[in-house]
Amino acid sequence: SWCDPATLKYVSGITGCRAMVKLQCL
């Protein structure tokens, strides 16, 4: 899941993580 910190970090690091969280989690 994108909301998962581990997954987000693995996907695109910190920058990508923030973008994914805003697009997916929100």
From Swiss-Prot:
Lineage: Eukaryota, Viridiplantae, Streptophyta, Embryophyta, Tracheophyta
GO cellular component labels: extracellular region
Subcellular location: Secreted
Keyword Coiled coil: no
Family stated for the protein in its record: Belongs to the protease inhibitor I6 (cereal trypsin/alpha-amylase inhibitor) family.
Annotated protein name in UniProt: Alpha-amylase inhibitor 1
Function according to Swiss-Prot or TrEMBL: Alpha-amylase inhibitor.
Keywords: Alpha-amylase inhibitor, Secreted
Record-level Gene Ontology MF annotations: alpha-amylase inhibitor activity
Species this chain originates from: Saussurea costus
